[in-house]
């Protein structure tokens, strides 16, 4: 029976790299995969997943109105899909998470999601909360703080390098805007503004 997986971490842990490698492993064996990413995440171009180390792939996009189950079911009816991959899973809606669960349960296709657990304020993303609750398997991807401890938190910085403590939960940005910290250094950074 297929499973729904949630691979989570903070920024710059290699989530997209791992997704692209796993998808390649299927494709190398002649199996078809589908990769999805958020439509508004255009850091690598719309409909593209890219890693910091230079790997990239085209991807289908999702937005609030996308029915992931219907889309995957239709594509699977045309040609078998061996695995579904979702990058930036923290940008899914809660109903998307249940659609992904249905892909695993009803279509018997493994679904591998990759995303952030918490935002810059230390709060769970709604989709991450749902994935933590219902995913069959949870996998933490580790990265490190500047002190060498495991990084579990992320801080957002403005264009002047000052820590941001308020604002929209979702704001697309990369290496210069977000920095990963252990909890101790996140608290010190977050409280210093």
Curated annotation (Swiss-Prot):
Annotated catalysed reactions: thymidine + ATP = dTMP + ADP + H(+)
GO molecular function terms noted in the UniProt entry: ATP binding; thymidine kinase activity; zinc ion binding
Gene Ontology biological-process entries: DNA biosynthetic process; thymidine metabolic process
Enzymatic class: transferase
UniProt-annotated binding residues for Zn(2+): 145, 147, 182, 185
GO cellular component: cytosol
Main location: cytoplasm
Entry's family note: Belongs to the thymidine kinase family.
PANTHER family xref list: THYMIDINE KINASE (PTHR11441), THYMIDINE KINASE, CYTOSOLIC (PTHR11441:SF0)
Name listed for the protein in its UniProt record: Thymidine kinase
Organism whose genome encodes this protein: Agrobacterium fabrum (strain C58 / ATCC 33970) (Agrobacterium tumefaciens (strain C58))
Gene that specifies this protein: tdk
């Amino acid at each position: 029976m297929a499973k729904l997986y949630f691979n989570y971490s903070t920024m710059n842990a290699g989530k997209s790299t791992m997704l692209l490698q796993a998808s390649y492993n299927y494709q190398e064996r002649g199996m078809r995969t589908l990769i999805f990413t958020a439509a508004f995440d255009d850091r690598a171009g719309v409909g593209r997943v890219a890693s910091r180390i230079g790997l990239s792939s085209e991807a289908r996009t999702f937005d609030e109105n996308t029915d992931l189950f219907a889309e995957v079911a239709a594509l699977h009816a045309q040609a078998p899909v061996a695995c579904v991959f979702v990058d930036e899973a923290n940008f899914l809606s809660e109903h998307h998470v249940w659609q992904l669960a249905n892909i695993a349960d009803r279509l018997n296709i493994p679904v591998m999601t990759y995303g952030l657990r918490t935002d810059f304020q230390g709060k769970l993303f709604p989709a991450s909360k749902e994935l933590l609750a219902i995913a069959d398997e949870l996998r933490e991807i580790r990265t490190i703080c500047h002190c060498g401890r495991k990084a579990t938190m992320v801080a957002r910085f403005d264009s002047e390098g000052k820590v941001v403590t308020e604002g929209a939960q979702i704001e697309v940005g990369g290496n210069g805007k977000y920095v990963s910290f252990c909890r101790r250094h996140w608290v010190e950074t977050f409280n210093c503004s």
